[in-house]
Amino acid sequence: MTDTPRHTATATTHIAEPPDRVWAELTHPGARWVLGANIETDYRPGSPITFEGHFFGRVFADKGRVLAVDRPRLLHFTHFSPMSDLEDIPENYHEIRIVLEPDDGGTRVTVTQENIDTEQHAAAAEGHWRDALATLAHRDGGTRTSHR
């Protein structure tokens, strides 16, 4: 493991739907709420998870492993992006936790991405997660979200 400081990105939103409904949207096959990516996994601990799509005109194929699932409260997985130009070794994988909590008649969704190599990349990741959560919250075309 490296002694280089690592960084964390966090994004949170409120969705005016119950956790079961948000979980269903989050895990729906073909739900392209993460940067328009196609997400493939069976959501079982130990299973692979892949994200494929286009980002600023570049094709990407990110990967990881599902670490934990507690429906409808937690999705925890590792993540590696070849676009990072980092070596594909465990030390360079992010850990991402998506937590759903009942909140004021809806759901508070918090995404935490850990083990990011630079402060600049952490800030960019936070922005991407805010965008992803906005997409998740507006999936039905409505305006049912507030960012915090």
Feature annotation, model-predicted:
Residues 6-12, 48, 61, 74, ...:
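Intrinsic-disorder/low-complexity, polar/charged segments enriched in Ser/Thr/Lys/Arg/Asp/Glu/Gln
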Residues 19, 38-51, 58:
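A solvent-exposed, acidic/Ser-Thr-rich amphipathic alpha-helical stretch
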Residues 22, 49-51, 66, 77, ...:
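Hydrophobic pocket/interface hotspot
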Residues 39-42, 57-104, 114:
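Hydrophobic-ligand binding "helix-grip"
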Residues 27-28, 71, 138-142:
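Residues at helix-coil transition
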Residues 92, 114-148:
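A conserved amphipathic terminal alpha-helix motif
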Residues 27, 107-112:
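Ser/Thr-centric signal marking residues that sit
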Residues 1-40:
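Hydrophobic ligand-binding cavity/cleft-lining segments
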